[in-house]
Amino acid sequence: ADVPRTIARMIAAVFPRFDQKTFVRSSLDGYDALELMSRGWKIAHQLRHSLPDDYEKAVDILLASLDRKPERTVAQGMGGFLFLPHVFFVAEYGLEHFETSMRAQYVLTQRFTAEFSIRRYLERHQTATLSRLMEWSADSNEDVRRLVSEGTRPRLPGTGLRQCAWS
């Protein structure tokens, strides 16, 4: 239950019009009965209802709300899973906004792996995504390089990634 509350506080700090109470109440409705991944999806869907309809504005707010230090330990006891809903938000709502979503995944993966998100982009925008991942494979940040490795393994169980021309 701390994850939705923490996300609400983070967003409200940079977007004062954010309705924390409604977001938290909606996110926590049925929350305890859900597994971890389902909780992440539920919060991501509530973000869609609580942030501006304009995806690019919503992503700007989400990214602005992140702690300034891009360390996986910033979430304290929650671990990086605090950022799982952010990754799911990009996966679900950003497919038609390639550049904005790539920027978001680049930033987010430095806090929590964006592998769950990048796979949808490999399916929808295979050539452009592979090109970007090729650039990222030489990035100075190890988390970005790890995304390239983890996000392009289609045969792992539970990846949800169908066969691509390169697999």
Predicted features along the sequence, with ranges:
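Surface-facing alpha-helical segments and adjacent helix-coil boundary elements at the starts of domains
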Residues: A1-S167
